[in-house]
């Protein structure tokens, strides 16, 4: 977060302004998605000291491909207002390994998890569908790393935890 805030542009008249200060939410979501996906690739490859994962940019079946395993990982990201449910979207409703990340617009709070998400957890729509968080809470193959999924008064609540030191 701090690195992005440090990037500035010069406006007419020489005035300096934050480069990401007035960016649309969906564009910021795309930037978060790319940084997150590439970071997972880099960490896995560094840890294994060889290229295990690739992050193709050609609308491949998966966001992260493990060619030697003929498999992949789908990453889903969302920029989510505090107190709201994240909206993870997809064009394909596949069962498989997913890594989810939701971050608040100011970057201070995060929800993250990973695991196998069944295809029936997706609400189909055109042109994109959304992950049904109400079904996700009952999926035993999904693990929350940061934040929590809880049922309160019959409703599923997604809690984002602070990531500030």
Residue ranges and their predicted role:
Residues 72-74:
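Extended, Lys/Arg-enriched charged tracts that mediate electrostatic binding to polyanionic substrates
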Residues 1-62, 67, 77-165:
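Nucleic-acid endonuclease domains
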């Amino acid at each position: 977060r701090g690195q992005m805030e440090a990037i500035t542009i010069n406006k007419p008249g020489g005035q300096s302004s934050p480069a990401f200060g007035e960016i649309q939410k969906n564009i910021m979501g795309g930037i978060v998605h790319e940084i997150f996906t590439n970071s997972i690739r880099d960490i896995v490859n560094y840890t294994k000291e060889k290229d295990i994962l690739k992050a193709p940019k050609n609308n491949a079946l998966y966001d992260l491909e493990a060619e030697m395993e003929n498999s992949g990982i789908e990453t889903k990201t969302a920029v989510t207002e505090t107190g709201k449910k994240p909206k993870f979207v997809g064009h394909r409703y596949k069962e498989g390994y997913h890594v989810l990340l939701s971050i608040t617009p100011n970057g201070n709070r995060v929800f993250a998890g990973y695991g196998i998400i069944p295809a029936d957890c997706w609400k189909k729509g055109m042109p994109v569908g959304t992950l049904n968080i109400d079904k996700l809470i009952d999926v035993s193959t999904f693990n929350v790393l940061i934040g929590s999924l809880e049922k309160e008064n019959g409703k599923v609540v997604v809690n984002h935890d602070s990531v500030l030191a």
